[in-house]
């Protein structure tokens, strides 16, 4: 009878339960139940919780293990067994759930002679917002600010305060220029002169050239000529005045008034040909100096060598001369002996 009950209880443990589903909001706790029968309390019943289905994983991704009395392995503090383990209550409590906790879970109890397992499917949803989302208020078309193109870019040049930009110099003639020449005629001579007036209307144009200018002032006077033709000199007084980097042109409406004209400075033009000729002349001078040095050095060396040759040739010539004298004396003696050996030479001749 007892064996029959054990057999029936084993069959009941082998029957798998239906897969239950649980849904929880993120941040809350959830409990997955797992309770097995403790008919035989004398033997230990190890249990485990893991991720995945029981038939395929068998607690390979273990979360927690027990030996039937206490927890022997715990993957994280979020996984708790709050039931009475010795009474067969190994329900799993997951605290502070997150979205990644979603998925299948498996509980296995290793009962002697049989296995008990149960599968669960957990779904963790994201936390719902407490207030509805606010939609942005569309007040019309978006306003796009485009940069205003005012034409060419404005370049600010630094103002040089060292030199004045405008200088006005009024031309003032204090006394009229009058030249009188005495004449020896009976008739009266009348000389009419007109003084130089200061210009009433002055137009001043200013500019900033890089070089100083030369201002020539022409002052002309008219003289009325009478029969005796007394001439009045027309004086031209050029004035060379340095300017402060300004061209001043003064004109007047009166033709008899003084006219001051500004002669624009002529820019110095660089002549590249002149520099080329100067360079060629300098190069030719260097070559000539080098050739002279070589010639002088060679002449001194040759002169030194020729002096040593003369010094060697002098004793040689003396030795040769002495040898020639010895040979001549020997020849003379031979001739004398020949004459003595032939006493009949004079008679036969």
UniProtKB/Swiss-Prot annotation:
**InterPro entries according to UniProt:** Ig-like_dom, Ig-like_dom_sf, Ig-like_fold, Ig_sub, Ig_V-set, TIM_domain-containing_protein
Compositionally biased intervals (Polar residues): 222-260
* UniProt subunit comment: Homodimer.
What subcellular locations does the record give? Cell membrane
Q: Write out the GO biological process terms.
A: iron ion transport; phagocytosis, engulfment; positive regulation of mast cell activation
Q: Which stretches are Extracellular in the membrane topology?
A: 21-275
Residue span, Ig-like V-type domain: 22-123
Transmembrane feature ranges: 276-296
Q: Where is the composition biased (Low complexity)?
A: 136-215
- Disulfide linkages recorded for this protein, renumbered to the chain, are 34-107, 48-59, 54-106
Record gene name = Timd2
Any idea which UniProt keywords this protein has?
A: Cell membrane, Disulfide bond, Glycoprotein, Immunoglobulin domain, Membrane, Receptor, Signal, Transmembrane, Transmembrane helix
Gene Ontology cellular component annotations, sorted alphabetically: cell surface; plasma membrane
Record's signal peptide: 1-20
To which protein family does this belong? Answer: Belongs to the immunoglobulin superfamily. TIM family.
Give me the Cytoplasmic side stretches, as residue ranges. 297-349
Query: Can you say what this protein is called?
Result: T-cell immunoglobulin and mucin domain-containing protein 2
């Amino acid at each position: 009878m007892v064996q029959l009950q054990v057999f029936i209880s084993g069959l009941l443990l082998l029957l798998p339960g239906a897969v239950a589903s649980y849904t929880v909001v993120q941040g809350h706790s959830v409990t997955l139940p797992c309770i097995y029968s403790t008919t035989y309390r004398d033997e230990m019943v190890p249990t485990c919780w893991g991720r995945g289905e029981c038939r395929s994983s068998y607690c390979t991704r273990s979360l927690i293990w027990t030996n039937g009395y206490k927890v022997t392995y715990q993957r994280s503090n979020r996984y708790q067994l709050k039931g009475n383990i010795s009474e067969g209550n190994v329900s799993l409590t997951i605290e502070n759930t997150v979205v990644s906790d979603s998925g299948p879970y498996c509980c296995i109890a290793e009962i002697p002679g049989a296995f008990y397992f149960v599968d669960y499917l957990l779904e963790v949803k994201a936390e719902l917002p407490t207030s509805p989302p606010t939609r942005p208020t569309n007040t019309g078309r978006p306003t796009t600010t485009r940069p205003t193109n005012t034409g060419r870019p404005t370049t600010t040049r630094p103002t040089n305060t060292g030199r004045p930009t405008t200088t006005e110099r009024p031309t003032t003639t204090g006394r009229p220029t009058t030249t009188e020449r005495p004449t020896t005629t009976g008739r009266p001579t009348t000389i009419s002169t007109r003084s130089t007036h200061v210009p009433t209307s002055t137009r001043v144009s200013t500019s900033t050239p890089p070089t100083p200018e030369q201002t020539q002032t022409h002052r002309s006077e008219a003289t009325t000529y009478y029969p005796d033709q007394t001439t009045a000199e027309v004086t031209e007084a050029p004035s060379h005045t340095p300017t402060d980097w300004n061209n001043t042109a003064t004109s007047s409406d009166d033709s008899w008034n003084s006219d001051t004209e500004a002669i624009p400075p002529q820019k110095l033009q660089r002549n590249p040909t002149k520099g080329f000729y100067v360079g060629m002349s300098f190069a030719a001078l260097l070559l000539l100096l080098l050739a002279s040095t070589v010639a002088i050095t060679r002449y001194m060396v040759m002169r030194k060598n020729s002096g040593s040759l003369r010094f060697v040739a002098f004793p040689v010539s003396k030795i040769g001369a002495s040898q020639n004298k010895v040979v001549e004396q020997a020849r003379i003696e031979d001739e004398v002996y020949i004459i003595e050996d032939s006493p009949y030479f004079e008679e036969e001749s």
